[in-house]
């Protein structure tokens, strides 16, 4: 699974996932399914934000080829992917600036158009079950919840899906591709079932003992959202020339 993750996801996403697991004292060599899940969640958060801006009139617009002369503000502030200290700094800054209620738990995004925090979920189970788990944990009507599944299903608070249909379709297609690639490598069952995951882990560890890992070729294409992951996180003047560059798993 670890090799698959490094092949399938952008190196910057992999690096952020590694840092997140290290921060919580988790070993990606052992928790390989969690490693894959974190990378998937990160990519969905970035894709959610990609190409969405607010123009001078305060309207939400989609810009794929970007006009460097346009004064555009990113519609979504990305909170996921930051270390906890910086993430809470971002949240506090948003609350102080917008008057939004401070959430009890760290959300994934903030939507400047709808003025609300968003919790993104990616599940291998039934979307309604995962949605209820999220809602029971957050216990706040102020945080908007949007759940995606690997089967193309989704569920959101009050059936408000925030994004246009095409943007959501890109996310669903990416998740379906990840599922298909996992299945083709015999990894999907272990990704879904904890019991199968333990069996696969023992098999992988035994395999690693028998042979050294070969060099891995990775995709260098970068999502536009990843290009703005920098210290000046809250800079509202950020503008960039964007291009459609969604990641695809390399063929076997």
Swiss-Prot record:
Catalytic residues of the enzyme: 80, 108
- Localisation: Host cytoplasm; Host nucleus
The UniProt keyword set, sorted, is: Decay of host mRNAs by virus, Eukaryotic host gene expression shutoff by virus, Host cytoplasm, Host gene expression shutoff by virus, Host mRNA suppression by virus, Host nucleus, Host-virus interaction
Q: Which domain of life is it from?
A: Viruses
Q: Which GO terms describe its molecular function?
A: RNA binding
The site (Important for efficient shutoff activity and nuclear localization) lies at 195, 198-199
Entry's InterPro entries?
A: PA/PA-X, PA/PA-X_sf
Q: In its UniProt record, which GO terms are filed under biological process?
A: viral RNA genome replication; viral translational frameshifting
Task: Extract the Gene3D superfamilies matched here.
Answer: Influenza RNA-dependent RNA polymerase subunit PA, endonuclease domain
Instruction: Using the UniProt annotation, give all residue ranges assigned to the region (Disordered).
Output: 202-221
Q: Cite the record's Polar residues compositional bias ranges.
A: 208-217
**For site (Important for efficient shutoff activity), what residue positions does UniProt give?**
28, 65, 202-203, 206
* Role: Plays a major role in the shutoff of the host protein expression by cleaving mRNAs probably via an endonuclease activity. This host shutoff allows the virus to escape from the host antiviral response. Hijacks host RNA splicing machinery to selectively target host RNAs containing introns for destruction. This may explain the preferential degradation of RNAs that have undergone co- or post-transcriptional processing.
The record's comment about this protein's domains reads: The probable endonuclease active site in the N-terminus and the basic amino acid cluster in the C-terminus are important for the shutoff activity. The C-terminus acts as a nuclear localization signal. The C-terminus is recruited to host protein complexes involved in nuclear Pol II RNA processing.
Q: Which family does it belong to?
A: Belongs to the influenza viruses PA-X family.
Could you tell me what this protein is called? Protein PA-X
| Gene source species | Influenza A virus (strain A/USA:Iowa/1943 H1N1)
């Amino acid at each position: 699974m670890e090799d698959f993750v490094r092949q399938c996801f952008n190196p910057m996403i992999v690096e952020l996932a590694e840092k997140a697991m290290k921060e919580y004292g988790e070993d990606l060599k052992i928790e390989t399914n969690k490693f894959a899940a974190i990378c998937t969640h990160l990519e969905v958060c970035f894709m959610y934000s990609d190409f969405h801006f607010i123009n001078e009139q305060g309207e939400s617009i989609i810009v794929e080829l970007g006009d460097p002369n346009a004064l555009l503000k990113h519609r979504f502030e990305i909170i996921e992917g930051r270390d906890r200290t910086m993430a809470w700094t971002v949240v506090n800054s948003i609350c102080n600036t917008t008057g939004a209620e401070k959430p009890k738990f760290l959300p994934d995004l903030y939507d400047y158009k709808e003025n609300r925090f968003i919790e993104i979920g990616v599940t291998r189970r039934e979307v309604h079950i995962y949605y209820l788990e999220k809602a029971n944990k957050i216990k706040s009507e102020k945080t908007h919840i949007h759940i995606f599944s690997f089967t193309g299903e989704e569920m959101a608070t009050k059936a408000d899906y925030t994004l246009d249909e095409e943007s959501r379709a890109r996310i669903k297609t990416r998740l379906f591709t990840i599922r298909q690639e996992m299945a083709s490598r015999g990894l999907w069952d272990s990704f879904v079932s904890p019991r199968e995951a333990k069996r696969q882990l023992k098999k992988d560890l035994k395999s690693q003992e028998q042979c050294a890992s070969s060099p891995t070729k990775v995709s260098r294409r970068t999502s536009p959202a990843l290009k703005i992951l920098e210290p000046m996180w809250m800079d509202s003047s950020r503008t960039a020339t964007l291009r459609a560059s969604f990641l695809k798993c390399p063929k076997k």
